[in-house]
Amino acid sequence: MSRKPPAAVARQLRQEAGFGCCACGLPIIQYHHIVEWAGDQHFRAQDMMVLCPLHHDQATKGAMPEAEQRRFKANPCNIQRGLAQGLLKVSQDYCAANFGSVTIVGEGPFVRIDGENIQSFHIGPGNLEISLRLFSKTDELLLEIDRNEWISGDPLPWDIEADWQKLTLRESSRQISVSLNAKPVPVELKGELWRGGKRASLDARGIHIDGATYPFGIEELALVGIVLNIDTGKLSFGASPQNPYAVIVSWPDRRERLWKARDKWREIKAKVLSADAR
């Protein structure tokens, strides 16, 4: 039997905790069984809570007694601070990030390296949800996050910092890091990653592999519902599997181009929802 809670239970636990760890408010969470799973394979929301990976590790190893767990559950950090929608609260209904002068707008995978979805974005119930797959220099999968849920990986080597609309994950040796600032739109995104034994850097200037900048061959465009595909030899772009109606928006003014891309994304999303309903 899978330990992953049903969607309705998971949603209730996230909402009651203010979309963050009950103990500290971090937006990257795991689902914790206060009444231990080993003795009772249950999904009772009253006996579960959400914790960040480090507090979850403490709780499962006995360093956080049940009474303390229940105090955190009854008084979640974000709720006490008036952050009912968590630290990654956003008001927009779309995701956008800049890579050089190119803006990607949509939801789902934004960057894929050597066939792996490295970075994805979604809009949750008023908050930004990120997905990450981060690899070591030897191409070992170090961590996986799916829509703000820590799926796999040892949390101890990682420094996770969060502030209002900001999130940083940094590996202890500082060889790998990802940070985002969701205050501006498009979001500001930076990353120092490894894939296939090569170092990949992502920032507002573009994408760099082992120090060499990857030319897009395009400038001053918005890619709507499109994912960047990177391998060790080339960079390309194409429709995300989730967004078959992808388009490219060309407009001289960057702010107006973003608005036009946003409107196109809303049209695409309506088409996808309509097709799924058939």
Kindly give the residue locations of the regions a language model identified.
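Histidine-centered nuclease catalytic patch
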Residues: 2-77
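Extended charged
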Residues: 72-278
